[in-house]
């Protein structure tokens, strides 16, 4: 995310090895006396010329991280192309002597993907990102696959409408109905991917402004046994590869541990 990396955060941070280590160490120290584990998630690096994951993985472990997750893309790739699972395998091998779990992330859209990633990379587990957008049942499928059990059947359209309503109700309990009605709109598109509901219904759902309106729009589909066509796959924006925005002189000295100017006002990840 440019607004994050241009301040030295997100995928730009591990390039500054000492600064990265200081931050992980501080987080670990802050949790002393608790049972809260500090874990680190990172990308392969800034771009193909600046891979950071092997050094950063080792630094994270030495700084006390309980687990390390690698998304198999560089920041420059955004979500384009395919995740480099071979880099997850490299990190797992690199940290094998530490005993610290290495988790894989990137292009996990179905249960089979998780099983295949673990088989190909030797990673200790997987983290799911975009693949669960509009598909929260994916986690039950992943659990079944990794336990060697039968994969649960995909939900029908009627069942999905009930999940949408429950999601919206929980949002309303947390953020109020007005905010919930706005926030659920983006999720509805993901939930209904591949279902034959028609453009007019989708347009109405994209403008829903209350829970009652949502219930009314979804009611005709409550008993539908339709199944989604081609519902798995990438969700959200994929983008195109692009140059990563960095602070001036960021690449000059990887051992510089100075905190970038205004870094403390941006803490949303990246």
Residues covered by each model-derived region:
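A short, structure-level motif marking secondary-structure boundaries and short turns
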Residues: 9, 40-42, 72-74, 99-100
């Amino acid at each position: 995310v440019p607004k994050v990396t241009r301040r030295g955060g997100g995928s730009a941070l591990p390039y500054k090895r000492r600064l990265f280590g200081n931050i992980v160490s501080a987080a670990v120290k802050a949790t002393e006396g608790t049972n809260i584990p500090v874990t680190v998630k990172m990308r392969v690096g800034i771009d193909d010329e600046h891979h950071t994951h092997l050094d950063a993985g080792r630094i994270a472990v030495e700084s006390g991280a309980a687990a390390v997750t690698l998304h198999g893309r560089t920041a420059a790739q955004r979500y384009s192309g395919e995740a480099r699972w071979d880099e997850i395998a490299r990190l797992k091998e690199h940290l094998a002597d530490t005993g610290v779990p290495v988790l894989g992330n990137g292009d996990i859209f179905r249960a089979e993907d998780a099983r295949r990633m673990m088989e190909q990379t030797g990673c200790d587990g997987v983290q799911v990102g975009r693949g669960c957008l509009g598909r929260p049942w994916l986690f039950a499928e992943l659990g079944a696959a990794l336990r060697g059990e039968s994969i649960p059947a995909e939900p029908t359209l009627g069942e999905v409408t009930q999940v949408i309503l429950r999601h919206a109700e929980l949002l309303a309990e947390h953020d109020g109905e007005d905010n919930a009605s706005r926030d659920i709109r983006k999720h509805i598109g993901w939930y209904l991917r591949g279902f034959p509901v028609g453009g007019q219904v989708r347009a109405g759902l994209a403008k829903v402004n209350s829970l009652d309106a949502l219930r009314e729009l979804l009611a005709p589909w409550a008993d539908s046994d339709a199944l989604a066509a081609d519902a798995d796959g990438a969700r959200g924006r994929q983008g195109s590869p692009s140059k990563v925005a960095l602070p001036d002189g960021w690449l000059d000295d990887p051992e510089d541990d100075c905190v970038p100017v205004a870094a403390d006002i941006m803490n949303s990840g990246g």
